[in-house]
């Protein structure tokens, strides 16, 4: 049975390889069939290709379906339109603004048990924009002084009011037969 799966795996790989080889022979390099390899690509062409936009991207199926580990998936990755490219500011990132789902047939193999073609849904991006990076927004919003320089790990802070409170709760301390000291935010032995 393992021998048969190996032959199926290699047969599919060969089929994909020869199909891609035919496509690459038929397609002009970089979209411009009349360009020579030593020719310099003009700035505007380079710039237009680099802007934030939906680009065909190879995506690992396990990245989209991490719980499918009991199967061998063929192919293991799929071509999807995803946002890619550059923004003109380091504080910006290329993100999707419009999404849609596409369903593809994927072969699911369960070693020594079964194999079947199964429809799987994937998210594609149809429009992209440059928007502020999440880390940048968090840094701009965080205007509060830290609760404690030495023991930051003991406190949590409300980002809107800057109010500090203990991460540990009184009930958590009591479950360990301790009491919460609200001044130090530590669980301590009860005083007698």
UniProtKB/Swiss-Prot annotation:
Biological process (GO), any one: positive regulation of mast cell chemotaxis
CDD domains, per database record: PDGF (cd00135)
Species in which this protein is naturally found: Agkistrodon piscivorus piscivorus (Eastern cottonmouth)
GO molecular function: chemoattractant activity; growth factor activity; heparin binding; vascular endothelial growth factor receptor binding
Record-annotated disulphide pairs: 52-94, 83-128, 87-130
Protein name as annotated: Vascular endothelial growth factor A
Protein keywords: Angiogenesis, Developmental protein, Differentiation, Disulfide bond, Glycoprotein, Growth factor, Heparin-binding, Mitogen, Secreted, Signal
Assembly behavior: Homodimer; disulfide-linked. Also found as heterodimer with PGF. Interacts with FLT1/VEGFR1 and KDR/VEGFR2 receptors, heparan sulfate and heparin.
